[in-house]
Amino acid sequence: ALTAYLGEAPQLKYPTQSTGGPLSPFVFGDWNGDGRTDAAVFDVSAAKGQNVHVAVLEQQEGAWAVTQEKEGLATTVESIATASIQATGGTQLLVGYASASGEKYLAVYDYQQQTLSEVLHESYSQYELRDITGSGANDLVIISSSQGEGMQLKLFTAESGRFISTQQLALNPQFTSCEGLYSSLGEDGSYYLILDGQTGSGVSLASAILYYDARLQQLGEYAAITETDLYNATQRYSPLLRSQDIDGDGTVEIPRQIDTGGLGALTVNRLSFIAWMDYTSEYEQEKSFGVADLEYGYYLELPDALKGDVMVTDGDLPDSWQVRSADGETLYLTVRVTAPGVEGAGYFRLGNIGAQKVQARIGSAHASLRPAQLAGGFVVL
């Protein structure tokens, strides 16, 4: 249908970042609220220049037909999301565009009566779509940065089927850019925002936590119970160490790169002890502890029973490392990175990183070391 409409075969444009599903130039939803599934497709064509175009297709007489097309804001689609905030039941389309110069723009589209309208247009670094205010409808939070003004947060809430700007907030001036924005489910059932930002030094990341104060009806910075200076407490020195839901419980944990004091000895430069922290919890804040390989980009959770009682050293083989007893005499675990076809006596697979696999072998018996548990604690960073 799109080829017939354009008179040529277009180049489909895949988003470069996933918002939860597989990457696809097609997205489906009931855009106009008529109860039937519509489609949107992103493409570029020689006749219409370098910018991405978005076309809306409806089902007509058993076939797809293009009903509207609109030029996008840049040459690349970074992300695609949808939001159902209209009383009519229609769904709005959120598209993050990126230009070759690095500028990014978020467009919100509304489709009614076979007309695609751009109802919101904002520059952004990161955005998050979630019911932050507890209204029952998705809110839109946009982080942007401009030279001389630092990072700004804008909160848009859903009113009368539109996103309405309700707050602007200047963020910690020590951050120079936003590298990640995540919604995190708290113990109280409400959502917090976890922000990862580049620090002023340019060589480290740090984090901030934002929450919605229902009494003030505003987003503000959350004061962690156990940390008076969350910015400095969460500084880490690898771009791989971004916040994520490390244990799959809906809460996003912040990785804390920690020294070896009281935890054991670590003598391999590419490795680091990491504690994944939920600073919004009143009780158990450390959700996972283990070792991150910052060269190959993976994390391996270690059993709590080994914490403070081990040393981590280079292994006997290239790209391998070992977990030993604190005195170095007892070998508990060997971890190595190998080619896919390499096997070894006693080794089992932890996971894959690109075209390589990570294996482990348990040495002397330790009650807390079990293959299934170790494989379950393997995470690609």
Predicted regions span which residues?
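Beta-propeller-forming repeat regions
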Residues: 1-314, 321, 341-344, 348-353, ...
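Membrane-interface alpha-helices
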Residues: 316-328
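A short acidic-to-branched-hydrophobic micro-motif
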Residues: 325-341
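A bilobed periplasmic-binding-protein/Venus flytrap-type ligand-binding module shared by bacterial periplasmic
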Residues: 361-362
